[in-house]
UniProtKB/Swiss-Prot annotation:
It holds the Pfam family DUF4645. It comes from Homo sapiens. InterPro entries: DUF4645. Transmembrane segments: none annotated. Residues 36-56 are annotated as: Disordered. This is Proline-rich protein 32.
Length: 298
């Protein structure tokens, strides 16, 4: 017989008993006492309403070892592990926390799952560093430096230290490199300077900057730039040498401190009688003479 329990909300209101005969037919019996065979004794049997919580099995590495092998020293190492100390450090649910942390740390460094954490934003750091001893460059990723000698633990992440041979390895540039034109004339405050292409730091190589000063009207500055005039050995006043190019600045205008004044000209002739003078109506005899102060006192 088999027992089936219809559990709804943690309660079992209607138990069903299914009986199977020899031919394989099933018969349902209602309102019958529930009888189930259990391998557990009655004292250890748990109620059906409570779920069973499986306990974590205890993991002990030293269970398969014999007590004699632990107490007696081994032939290879010659070390002796007392049995009473191992029994004192046993943990009911597995190895002690210190051993578990060491095993997890070793597994994290040796496994490839630690590489997934380096993809997080803000924690990626790829640096190429040279050793102090002058060896090949090394690629460092993250926070802990893993070397052939051992493992150095950092504060944040684990670093991967890979030695690279010199002359090998490709590292893409960090940003796009945009190269400008070979030479661009610069115009500042009316002074045009044109630097020839090449290394401008090396002097005395026959490459000098051409500087011109436009002194003409306020039109487009390109129209005021003087053009180079080729000078050959046939030009008078110059020594016999190869053909050279030079700039001859234009002559400055003559400075005139006086402003341009109009020229004086004679007035046009007047056809007609001359106008009488303004003082012609006044006669000298008709004007009274001023009285002197001496006559009043006399």
């Amino acid at each position: 017989m088999a027992c089936i329990e219809n559990v709804l909300g943690g309660h079992a209101p209607s138990p069903l008993v299914v009986s199977v005969d020899k031919n394989g037919n099933q018969e349902l019996h209602h309102d019958m006492p529930l009888q189930c065979l259990s391998s557990k004794p009655e004292d250890d049997a748990e109620p059906w309403g409570q779920p069973q919580v499986p306990l974590r099995p205890s993991v002990n590495v030293l269970t398969d070892l014999d007590s004699k092998q632990l107490e007696w020293p081994s032939e290879r190492t010659g070390s002796c592990i007392p049995l009473h100390s191992l029994r004192a450090h046993r943990h009911p649910y597995g190895p002690p926390p210190a051993v578990a942390e060491e095993s997890l740390a070793t597994a994290e460094v040796n496994s490839s799952d630690a590489l997934a954490g380096w993809r997080q934003e803000g924690q990626d750091a790829i640096n190429v560093s040279w050793e102090v001893s002058g060896g090949p460059p090394a690629l460092i990723v993250g926070g802990t430096k893993v070397n052939n000698g051992g493992t150095e633990r950092g504060s944040n992440n684990a670093r991967l230290h890979v030695a690279l041979p010199q002359g090998k390895g490709f590292f893409p540039p960090r940003g796009p490199q945009v190269r400008g034109p070979s030479h661009i004339p610069t115009l500042r405050s009316g002074i045009v300077m044109e630097v020839p292409p090449g290394n401008t730091r090396i002097a005395c190589r026959g490459k000098l900057a051409h500087v011109s000063f436009p002194l003409r009207g306020p039109c487009h500055p390109m129209h005021n730039w003087p053009r180079p005039i080729p000078l050959s050995s046939s030009t008078p006043g110059l020594p016999s040498c190869s053909t050279v190019h030079c700039f001859i600045p234009p002559r400055p205008p003559i400075f005139n401190p006086f402003l341009t004044m109009p020229l004086p000209f004679a007035p046009p002739p007047i056809f007609g009688p001359p106008l009488p003078s303004y003082f012609a109506h006044f006669h000298s005899g008709g004007m009274p003479a001023p009285a002197s102060p001496n006559r009043e006192h006399s």
